[in-house]
Curated annotation (Swiss-Prot):
Assigned GO CC terms: cytosolic large ribosomal subunit
Organism annotation: Shewanella oneidensis (strain ATCC 700550 / JCM 31522 / CIP 106686 / LMG 19005 / NCIMB 14063 / MR-1)
Record-level GO BP terms: translation
InterPro entries reported in the protein's UniProt record: Rbsml_bL25/Gln-tRNA_synth_N, Ribosomal_bL25/Gln-tRNA_synth, Ribosomal_bL25_long, Ribosomal_bL25_short, Ribosomal_L25_dom, Ribosomal_uL5_bac-type
Family indicated by similarity: Belongs to the bacterial ribosomal protein bL25 family.
Keyword RNA-binding applies: yes
The keyword Metal-binding is assigned to this record: no
Lineage of source species: Bacteria, Pseudomonadati, Pseudomonadota, Gammaproteobacteria, Alteromonadales
Name of the featured protein: Large ribosomal subunit protein bL25
């Protein structure tokens, strides 16, 4: 199964910025690896919560449409809230 997530590049970095994004229903994330510069991104929480419910999300290549350009990535790490069904941050690596 293929997964596609639409994301935007983050302009504000830091704890306060991340908290504001989470409060607005967004998920901060980062894409790194393959000798490229890390890219901070943000996307809607509903996009990732539905996709990650399937086990093959963690092993398959996820397509992120980042500012109109498609990027193939894999989920490396995911931080979740302690008791709420909320994803707080995702690390992706280039596929």
């Amino acid at each position: 199964m293929s997964y596609t997530i639409t994301a935007q590049t983050r302009t504000e970095i830091g704890k306060g910025s991340s908290r504001r994004l989470r409060h607005a229903g967004k998920v901060p994330a980062v894409i790194y690896g393959a000798g490229k510069e890390p890219v901070s991104i943000v996307f809607d929480h509903k996009d990732i919560i539905n996709a990650q419910a399937n086990d093959d999300f963690y092993t398959s290549v996820v397509t992120i449409v980042l500012d109109g350009k498609e990027v193939g990535v894999r989920a490396q790490a995911m931080q979740r809230h302690a008791f709420k069904p909320i994803i707080e941050h995702v690390d992706f690596v280039y596929a």
